[in-house]
Regions:
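N-terminal secretory signal peptides that target proteins for export/translocation
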Residues: 1-8
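Short, solvent-exposed turn/loop segments enriched in Gly/Ser/Thr/Pro and often Arg
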Residues: 72-95, 144-154, 227, 449-454
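Bacterial N-terminal signal peptides
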Residues: 11-23
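Acidic/histidine-rich catalytic neighborhood
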Residues: 260, 264-270, 276-326
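Active-site neighborhoods of enzymes that stabilize oxyanions during catalysis
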Residues: 110, 126-127, 308-436, 440
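A long, amphipathic alpha-helix that forms part
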Residues: 49-50, 200-224, 229-272, 336-344, ...
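His/Asp/Glu-rich, glycine-adjacent segments
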Residues: 96-237, 336
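Active-site-proximal N-terminal segment of extracellular/periplasmic enzymes that hydrolyze or transfer
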Residues: 28-71
């Protein structure tokens, strides 16, 4: 025992130096360690949900309270295209998809070899994210079902990920999450992981994780993504009974996370945001751009109707599509593609409202590698597939993915916290959310397109009641 004590006394200085060295790499900015930010994204939530809930028969007391007491936007301008993964990445980077690199939900897969792979991995993001900057400054971070967080460095992580098109069950996400996280949540909420055997996983289960993490770890930054509203609006349409029920369920989960912040004692120091990534529209028919390309001889199929070769190919995202050239310098193919799609925009029955040039895509912050983009006409959507009819009945009524200048694609924003000036926010953009949160946490996002919202002023923790 004495010899052990002498050994420990000799080792103690080295241990202290090691601890100090580790701490030096993650030093929190002065005054920021006591601050917290919680961002809850309700995927596909339309601003009319909280600006006129009575018109839709919605009972959302929590969102209504936040609107009454905080600041809110009648419509946040999104990104090109208005889909989940580019939008969420623009929120946390402050830049457009052209710069952060997450240019759609699914990875462009012209020959169908990647089984519907999405942009899952944090390593694919080309610029710093809000959670990277926070972690590097010594702040505690939690990421729960936030898109593009596979492999993210965070203190608590459950990424959004699935294999193929079926139900994975809880084992996969448990294995991909921070070790011990799901065990801790299971002790607080026994059986919560059963919700991951449904499609989509229930929002309540992700909120269970958030509640446990907030109360147990008190993170400085928590990002939570709830996806059921988006799912049911796709399946049954905007404002359908199923979609309305999902909005009300999401409202209840927001209330749970707020209560957890109060219980943890961090609410007076918390900037609290409820956001969405895009709006929604309805479709009755779908157009398959790749079928049109195949009919023009620009895509060749093998005996199994798989793509054997292609000169031009589309990736679709509901309200829009990108068209890529196999050889970007192939002027002959470029001319044939323009000749195919340009006249269709003048034909209402074609289902295509607009063809966007490469320069127009760049002006909207879209993929710089795309040759051109298509925008669906009202009542139409653009969908994948190289076989079948070029125009067909829509398999489901709800879509998004249009360019961001279409008002129905506007996203949502409600914010409360110390220094927040209550009332209406005009001119908000998704790229403003990250810089707004960063300023509150005392960190800097350099060389970004967004700017902190004026409604969220200088931090003043004493401004919020307990």
């Amino acid at each position: 025992m004495i010899r052990s004590s002498r050994w420990f006394r000799k080792l103690l200085p080295a241990l202290l130096l090691a601890v100090l060295a580790v701490g030096a790499g993650r030093s929190a900015p002065a005054g920021a360690a006591a601050r917290h930010a919680i961002v809850i994204s309700i995927d596909g939530l339309m601003p009319a949900s909280y600006t006129e809930p009575e018109a839709h028969g919605l009972k959302i007391p929590t969102l209504c309270q936040l609107v009454a007491e905080g600041a809110w936007s009648p419509g946040v301008r999104g990104v090109m295209p208005a889909v989940t993964y580019p939008s969420h990445t623009s929120m946390v980077t402050g830049v457009s998809p052209a710069r952060h690199g997450i240019i759609s939900n699914a990875v462009f897969d012209p020959e169908g070899k990647r089984d519907g792979e999405w942009w899952w991995y944090t390593a694919e993001i080309r610029v710093p994210t809000l959670w990277m900057l926070a972690h590097d400054r010594g702040l505690r971070t939690a990421l729960i079902a936030w898109p593009v967080t596979m492999g993210a460095q965070a203190d608590a992580l459950t990424p959004e990920f699935w294999r193929g098109r079926g139900i994975d069950g809880p084992q996969l996400l448990r294995a991909l999450s921070t070790p011990g996280l799901w065990d801790a949540v299971g002790r607080r909420f026994p059986g919560f992981d059963a919700a991951f055997s449904t499609l989509p996983p229930k929002d309540e289960a992700f909120a269970d994780i958030a509640v446990d993490v907030v109360e147990r770890e008190r993170p400085n930054l928590l990002l939570l993504h709830l996806s059921a509203v988006d799912h049911w609006q796709h399946q049954n349409g905007p404002w359908s009974p199923e979609a309305l029920a999902a909005i009300e369920t999401a409202d209840a989960q927001v209330a749970r996370v707020m209560e957890a912040a109060r219980h943890a004692g961090i609410w007076p120091d918390t900037l609290f945001l409820v956001v969405s990534d895009h709006g929604f529209a309805r479709q009755e028919k779908v157009v398959r751009p790749s079928v049109l390309l195949r009919e023009r001889g620009l895509i060749t199929l093998d005996a199994q109707n798989r793509v054997a070769s292609w000169q031009a190919q589309a990736i679709t995202f509901g309200g829009g599509a990108y068209i890529y050239l196999h050889d970007p310098k192939d002027e002959s193919t470029a001319a044939r593609v323009r000749e195919l799609f340009s006249p269709l925009a003048a034909q209402p029955a074609s289902g295509i409202a607009r063809m966007l040039s490469h320069d127009e895509i760049a002006g909207l912050g879209g993929d710089p590698q795309a040759f051109l983009a298509l925008e669906a006409a009202d009542g139409f959507g653009l969908t994948a597939g190289v076989t079948g009819e070029a125009i067909a009945p829509a398999p489901n009524p709800g879509i998004h993915g249009f360019p961001p200048d279409r008002p129905t694609m506007n996203a949502s924003l409600v914010v409360t916290g110390p220094g927040v000036r209550p009332g209406r926010i005009e001119g908000a953009r998704l790229v403003d959310i990250g810089p707004t949160v960063a300023r509150w946490l005392g960190i800097t996002m350099k060389d970004v397109e967004g700017k902190p919202l004026e409604a969220v002023g200088a931090p003043n923790p004493s401004a919020r009641p307990q």
